[in-house]
UniProtKB/Swiss-Prot annotation:
Entry similarity comment: Belongs to the dCTP deaminase family.
Matching Gene3D superfamilies: 2.70.40.10
PANTHER family the UniProt entry points to: DCTP DEAMINASE
Name the UniProt record assigns to this protein: dCTP deaminase
EC identifiers of the protein: 3.5.4.13
Function of the molecule: Catalyzes the deamination of dCTP to dUTP.
Keywords: Hydrolase, Nucleotide metabolism, Nucleotide-binding
Residues forming the catalytic site: 138
Lineage: Bacteria, Pseudomonadati, Pseudomonadota, Gammaproteobacteria, Enterobacterales
Length: 193
């Protein structure tokens, strides 16, 4: 069962669901809470051989990832990041979200942005029970236009669903919780699988 706007407000008030900064009621609608774009972006190095061979050893994959993912951009609040056609970048939400063990979150892009060709997440829209941190966004511009993205703009919406029972293996207690408590754009850690 998904939380309604009333339930989202109650869960935040009772600190069962932690969102920092605490959202204004204007950001909570129906069954979602709007999240805003942070100011950190990572782009991929264009000068590198673009083949990432995932069949290689962890160590070899790690070396390749360090070469290809190395351009961090911090955009001031009154500036924009230009997302060119066909460009894939990682970005981050302004909000930090911490889920309890009995709640799963779902990240969805905004329809108005999708109609301009902006994809918010490549495949990973589930936010696991026990997960916490800033959400890393996987932007792709599928249009033929440059899209200007401004820190603080509404970028996505998150809904929350109550589990049938609390998870016995929530994200925050896993040995390999690679992305727990992330506060900046975090590269792929596929080399840690």
């Amino acid at each position: 069962m998904r939380l309604s706007d009333r339930d989202i407000e109650l869960w935040i008030k009772n600190k069962k669901l932690v969102i920092e900064p605490i959202p204004n009621k204007e950001l909570i609608h129906g069954v979602t809470i709007d999240v805003r774009l942070g100011n950190e972006f990572y782009t991929f190095c264009n000068k590198f051989n673009k083949n990432i061979d995932l069949s290689k050893s962890r160590n070899e994959i790690s070396k390749i990832l360090k070469k290809v993912m190395n351009k961090k951009h911090i955009i001031p609040n009154d500036h924009v990041f230009l997302l060119k056609p066909g460009m894939f970048v990682l970005a981050i939400t302004l909000e930090k979200i911490f889920l309890p063990n009995n709640l799963v979150g779902w990240l969805d892009g905004r329809s108005s942005l999708a109609r301009l060709g902006l994809m918010i997440h490549a495949t990973s829209h589930r936010i696991d029970p026990g997960w916490g941190g800033n959400i890393v966004l996987e932007f792709f511009n599928s249009s033929n236009m440059i899209l200007s993205l401004c820190p603080g703009m509404l970028i996505a919406a998150v809904s929350f669903e109550i589990l049938s029972s609390p998870s016995i293996r929530p994200y925050n207690i896993r040995k390999n919780a690679k992305y727990f408590n992330q506060s900046e754009v975090t590269f792929s850690r596929i080399d840690q699988d």
